[in-house]
Each structure stands twice: as C-alpha cells, then as structure tokens.
Curated annotation (Swiss-Prot):
Residues in the signal sequence: none
Cofactor note: Binds 1 Mn(2+) ion per subunit.
SUPFAM superfamilies in UniProt: PEP carboxykinase N-terminal domain (SSF68923), PEP carboxykinase-like (SSF53795)
Involved pathway(s): Carbohydrate biosynthesis; gluconeogenesis
Keyword annotations of the record: ATP-binding, Cytoplasm, Decarboxylase, Gluconeogenesis, Lyase, Manganese, Metal-binding, Nucleotide-binding
EC number: 4.1.1.49
Name of the featured protein: Phosphoenolpyruvate carboxykinase (ATP) 2
Protein's organism: Salinibacter ruber (strain DSM 13855 / M31)
PROSITE patterns: PEPCK_ATP
Length: 530
C-alpha cells in the first residue's frame, strides 16, 4: 500500500490509501462505515444504501464526433454532452475533496496482457475499494510500482447526488462515461456493481475495435483443455453452472474472444446470493470467507450468521470474491477457443425444451434475441410470466449495435467449429403455477453430457414449435422431460402458450430483421401442427 498524489484529478485529501490490503480495508470499513460488520464466515457485510441494484435509466455516454457513429444510441445508451459531463465530474471531485480519507484501487481489466486495460478507482467508501480489489485483476508489487498512468479512471462519489437541474439528468443518480476522456463519474448511487459494469462497458466499446469480441458470459475449461461459454441473463444459472467441480473456472460473467482464445475481463466474481446453500452451490458457498464482500444481506445480530433466504433489504443480494476463492479457478483466466457455446434461458412459460442443439443460424437468432422470462410480480392477481429479450444476453451493457457483436460471434463459431446449445433452466411440466423448475441436478447432467460429447452423439428429434433439435435421451436425465409438450397434462394448452411465446419472439426480432440475414430470421420459431 502506498499514498498517491491525486492533485492531477483535482482531489487533495488528508489521507490517500492506494491498493490497501483487505485487512486494512476491513479496519477502515468497521471504523468509518456504520453499516459494516464481520460475518460469521469472515466476510465483510455492508449496505449499499438506497440503491441496491444498477440504475440503467441514469446511465449516460458522452456524444462525441470521434465515437458517435459507433454507438447504439437509444434507451440503453443515452447521450450527455461533454460540458455536462465535466460539470458532473467537478461535482464528484468537489465531494471527494470533502472526505478526509480517499481510497484508490489500481488494477487491470483483461487477463490477456495484449488486451488488458489499466483501471484506477477513486472512491470514499472502503467497501468500494475492497469490492474493486476483488473484481479487478490485482497487480503484483512490481506491476503496481510501474503502473504509470491508467487507461480508465472512475470517480465514485456515489454518496453525493447529481443536480437534477443539470442538463440530461433524470434523477439524483447519474452514471456517466466518456470514451474520449477515458473516465467515468458516479453520483447518487453507492451500489458497487456500477463500477464493475462501467469497466465492462468500456471493454465492450474498445475490444471490438481490435477485432476482439467482448461477451456477457461465463467460461470454464475441462481437464482436456476444452472450453465452454455460458450466456444468460440474471437468474438463468450462468454463475452456478459455470462453477463446476469437474472443470476449471475461467470466469463467471465477462469475457473476450480474441484470435488467441478467450480471456476473463475480471479478477473476481459477483455472485447472486439469494437462497444460497452449501448443498446446491458448494463452490460459491465456500468462497464466502475473509476478503469477500457481502452486499445488502441480513445477518443475526448476535452470531453474525448470514441468512441467505432473507430478502427484506433486496432480492439482489450479492457476494464479491476473488476468482481464486473458487477451488478450481484457472489463473491466469485464459483459455483456448471455445468448443461449446451454451445459451441459458429461464422459460417461465414452461414451453421450451430443457436442452436443444442449435444450428449456426439458430445460434445467431437466439443470441440476438437473448430471451428469458420471469414471473411478473407478487401483486395479487399477477400470475403470468413476463418475457424479457436482451440482445446478446446483455443489452444493458452493449455499446455498439447488437448485430456487430452477433456477426463477430458468427464468424468465430464458423472459424473454430464451435457447437451451440440452448439450455432452459426454467419451468417444465406445465405452465407457471403448475409446472416446476427443471431440477438443478438434471441441468447439470445435461451440461455434463454436452461436455463429454454424449449429447452431441445422442439421437435427436426436431421439436415442431421452435424448430429445435432435441435429444431424445440424456444420461442421468429422465427421457420424459426432454420434449416439453409431452410433460403437459393438456397438450392444447401447451400449444396456445407456445404460440403466445412464438409471437413474442417475432415481435422482438422485427427490429433486427433489416440488418439480419434472411437465414437468421428464418431460423427463429415457426408454428406448425403438433
């Protein structure tokens, strides 16, 4: 740990702690943060304040002549002018100057030295520094000594609100990025995930410029060196399924695919912790120990034991820990070209097969669609699922238009003969309220069969509604759950629900039809007689 002169950033605190050790950050948090406590496991528990999740409606990107033609402008990437960005940056600097103690975390984004980014975090909460200590790739003492000027700087003044009267502001929260300045400013939210996703957004912009595909996915590697990618929206099982005791974890959330293979962007994991148990997710459960940050969790005031089932603060409880806290993590987080690409969906309608083989065209269709479905809510009378479509299984983080990422993925699939699969971790045996979630042990068995090649060789039957090739048998999985229509007591009700979902797919894909090749559009679901 060393002090750092921050005057070049307009910040001159009494004390600056640079790359402080977790033990020191624990002390700082306990001493200066009234929400901090040490859990029974040794992890640091903390509250993020009013915001317990990301604020996508408050994200802004500076519109600049050098980059404006690259960016997918719209509700995902809303513009801010450079002058307003500078106003917000000065507001953040002014706030940070009122703090006696400032924490700096320098680290890398990207395990491949040829593509990594030097990142500097400037913040006023010890927990934010510890969080990014976990999430960035931690430099060695030699690397820290020669770190030099960063490629990207985050000013985290999340305890201080934005001025709602400032141009382009929609609330007291503002998360602003300038690709030209290589800076990010956070105001009005203390949710640590904003920093993580800010780094990802920058990588999502810079990497495609180098012909490197950036992806919202997890990745793992078998003992023979075979690599699998797992794409999926929140709650589909991306983190759970990639933390496989029989495979090495490359990473759980953000990766890039270059001409040399895949590499993890991060040095840690940010796992959802609601309902966490040692029986279901032992790798994640056992990673929660000294050095881990537990965000917005309820614990017993006497024993300090965490209740993972208590969501009274938020459903979005999280654990942040270094990658090497996973027993079979691969360090450095790099692997070869993927052999299997697995798209995960949580289909709450109960109509999609639990596993199916995709053609390259179907892979592109489902990548652009990025479908999952969740229950609408807990209000009385609300019992229908809501479909969610998120391009590239991570539209919230895309910078370029989705078709750019899809075309890059298609090129890499063709160049490296990767197999593509669609795995439904959602409902089977009937509609929501009647059916049940596909048991995790069955989903794991399907993933195992993909990895050992038995599912590729298994006999398959084309499912008529979605046009997917469905295996008729899979080791350690009951055959009668593989065809979804056959699991419903009322086949006609299945047909009606499936037709409804097909219509939602079609409605969503219309916005991409002009850019997508006809073969990709035709690879989508088509209703036929059952």
């Amino acid at each position: 740990m060393s002090d750092l002169d921050l005057s070049q950033y307009g910040i001159t605190p009494d004390t600056t702690l640079r790359n402080a050790d977790p033990a020191r950050l624990y002390e700082e948090a306990i001493h200066y943060d009234p929400t901090a406590a040490i859990a029974h496991s040794g992890a640091l528990t903390i509250r993020s304040g009013e915001k317990t999740g990301r604020s996508p409606a408050d994200k802004r990107i500076v519109r600049h002549p050098n980059s404006e033609d690259d960016i997918w402008w719209g509700p995902i990437n809303m513009e801010i002018d450079d002058h307003t960005f500078e106003i917000n940056k000065e507001r953040a600097q002014d706030y940070l100057n009122t703090r006696q103690r400032i924490y700096v975390m320098d680290g890398f984004a990207g395990w491949d030295p040829a593509h990594r980014l030097k990142v500097r975090i400037i913040c006023s909460r010890p927990y934010h520094a510890l969080f990014m200590h976990n999430m960035l790739i931690r430099p060695s003492q030699e690397e820290l000594a020669s770190f030099g000027e960063p490629d990207f700087v985050i000013y985290n003044a999340g305890e201080f609100p934005a001025n709602r009267q400032t141009k382009h502001m929609s609330s007291k929260t503002s998360v602003d990025l300038s690709f030209e300045n290589q800076e990010m400013v956070i105001l009005g939210t203390e949710y640590a995930g904003e920093m993580k996703k800010g780094v990802f957004t920058v990588m999502h912009y810079l990497m495609p410029k180098k012909d490197v595909l950036s992806m919202h996915c997890s990745a793992n590697e078998g003992d023979e060196g075979d690599v699998s990618l797992f794409f999926g929206l929140s709650g589909t099982g991306k983190t759970t399924l990639s933390a496989d005791p029989n495979r090495k974890l490359i990473g759980d959330d953000e990766h890039c695919w270059s001409d040399d293979g895949v590499f993890n962007i991060e040095g840690g994991c940010y796992a959802k912790a609601v309902g966490l148990s040692e029986e279901e997710e032992p790798e994640i459960y056992n990673a929660i120990r000294y050095g881990t940050v537990l965000e917005n969790m309820v614990y017993d005031e006497d024993t300090r034991a965490v209740d993972y089932d208590d969501t009274s603060i938020t459903q979005n409880t999280r654990a942040s820990y270094p990658l090497d806290y996973i027993d079979r993590a691969k360090i450095p987080g790099m692997g070869g070209h993927p052999d299997n690409i697995i798209f995960l969906t949580y289909d709450a309608f109960g109509v999609m097969p639990p596993v199916s083989k995709l053609t390259p065209e179907q892979a592109m269709y489902h990548f652009i669609s990025g479908y999952t479905a969740k229950v609408a809510g807990t209000e009385v009378g609300v019992d229908e699922p809501q479909a969610t479509f998120s391009a590239c299984f991570g539209a919230a983080f895309l910078v370029w238009p989705p078709d750019k990422y899809a075309e890059m993925l298609a090129e890499k699939i063709r160049a490296h003969d990767a197999e593509a699969w669609l795995v439904n971790t959602g409902i089977t045996g009937g509609p929501y309220g009647v059916g049940h979630r596909v048991p995790l042990e069955h989903t794991r068995a399907m993933i195992d069969a993909i990895h050992d090649g038995s599912l590729l060789d298994a006999p398959k039957k084309t499912e008529p509604v979605f046009g997917l090739d469905v295996p008729t048998e899979c080791p350690n999985v009951p055959n009668d759950i593989l065809m979804p229509r056959e699991t419903w007591d009322d086949p006609q009700a299945y047909d009606e629900k499936a037709e409804h979902l097909v219509g939602l797919f079609h409605d969503h894909f219309e916005k991409y039809e002009d850019e997508a090749a006809p073969a990709i559009a035709e690879a989508g679901p088509q209703l036929q007689a059952a």
